[in-house]
Amino acid sequence: MHDIKAIRDNQQAFEAAWSAKGRSGAAAEAVKLDALLRAAQTALQEAQAKRNESSKLIGMAKAKKDEAEATRLMAEVEHLKAVMASAAQTETEVGGQLRDLLASLPNIPAPEVPAGEDEAGNVEIRRWGDASKLPAGRLNNPKDHVDLGAALGGMDFEAAARMSGARFVVLKGQIARLERALGQFMLDLQTVQHGYTEVSPPLLVKDEALFGTGQLPKFKADLFKTSEQNWVERLDEQIALRVPPLLNITQTDVVENLKGLRAAASMDEQAARWLIPTAEVSLTNIVREQITDEAELPLRMTALTPSFRSEAGASGRDTRGMIRQHQFYKVELVSITTPDQSDEEHERMVGCAEAVLKALELPFRTMLLCTGDMGFGAKKTYDLEVWLPSQNTYREISSCSNCGDFQARRMDARFKKVGEKGARYVHTLNGSGLAVGRTLVAVLENYQDETGRITVPAVLVPYMGGVTHIGGEA
């Protein structure tokens, strides 16, 4: 959420930044709505002041028995009430339009972010690793993870489709164990070596949480939502069946009374919940509507959770295999910092994500995303892309973003600086450390040999109970 005063004072800068993200004209529209809103507020205040003054004069006129003046003033008061009602309506309507507009506008890119329309404008920062030194590097035609998983009897897409539909998978045996080993290894690395605090957060969240991190309202179609009324309606049915005989009343009476009670009472606890698309939502919202002491920052948190995404915008893309799933595990990294700390923390976070790939000896490259390829809430983003032999290319496996105070404003998350009376907005950062499913894909493909046997990366052997190979002698 953006500060309208900042937009008003720096309209050209905001216009240029949003134009780079495909929202040309947004700053002018926001300033126009703001002017209408302030005009309505001024009109309302002026009408209120005049009404109050006229109301006093009515009493004075009546005291002087000046009925004509009293009548005139009363008519003026009625007119002012109409003016106030109109101004109040305009304030409500325009204020809502302005809030909706501001909620829909993306973050402002940092100055060093390259201009570009899509991934073609991204800039490679560095590469690490040599794919030719891994087992798959010696193969002319490496298999993809789907064929490898099926041959090993550990990956079943058909069974998953029968129970859940497309973009799901059933992992079994040593492949399932390898996925679990990867998640545990990543979590241990980020907590023990990198100092992140492990958190076990909710997987179901309210609208406000997703608004805070920027998924709502813009990306509603990408989310899974639970049904909000099913259990309430079933409870109503049972009450309607069981209560009437006890009270000697009709079921219709009970049902009608329940409708009235539910309409009058807060439905907050029965409202729908959303499945988290990433643990970023749960972890970042821990500081929602909180004021954190500066001494506690940076606050670093990590979690290994399932993530749920509808992939509404990915129709036809990556339909084969585990690259793009509705449900997948991911180790998330979140940092809450002061504005002075966030740039350095961003670089540190990228290093923490890279450390996983280095430990697994998986070749990767680090990309700085351009303006047109960055996410909604990010002001600067690095993507890590891992080498996949079957595709002969690099694919995204982590995205690390500095969101500045963009999410903090939406969540009202602030910190108290020593020696200052007021509180400032924190900066929030998030990144994958890493996506477990895609890392599993990379391990299977890069560590395959000509027989389809998989060598377990050395750092994972302790997590695999000493197993060194999958599909052959341990």
From Swiss-Prot:
Q: What name does the UniProt record give this protein? A: Serine--tRNA ligase
Q: Which UniProt keywords apply?
A: Aminoacyl-tRNA synthetase, ATP-binding, Cytoplasm, Ligase, Nucleotide-binding, Protein biosynthesis
UniProt KW Magnesium keyword? no
Which residue windows are transmembrane per the record? none
Organism phylogeny? Bacteria, Pseudomonadati, Pseudomonadota, Alphaproteobacteria, Caulobacterales
Cellular component terms per the entry's GO annotation: cytoplasm
Q: Please give the Pfam families that the UniProt record associates with this protein.
A: Seryl_tRNA_N (PF02403), tRNA-synt_2b (PF00587)
The record ties this protein, via InterPro entries, to: aa-tRNA-synt_IIb, aa-tRNA-synth_II, aa-tRNA-synth_II/BPL/LPL, Ser-tRNA-ligase_type_1, Ser-tRNA-synth_1_N, SerRS_1_N_sf, SerRS_core, tRNA-bd_arm
Instruction: List its EC numbers.
Output: 6.1.1.11
Q: Say which family it is in.
A: Belongs to the class-II aminoacyl-tRNA synthetase family. Type-1 seryl-tRNA synthetase subfamily.
- Species this protein is from: Caulobacter sp. (strain K31)
Q: What is known of its domains?
A: Consists of two distinct domains, a catalytic core and a N-terminal extension that is involved in tRNA binding.
Q: Which gene encodes it?
A: serS
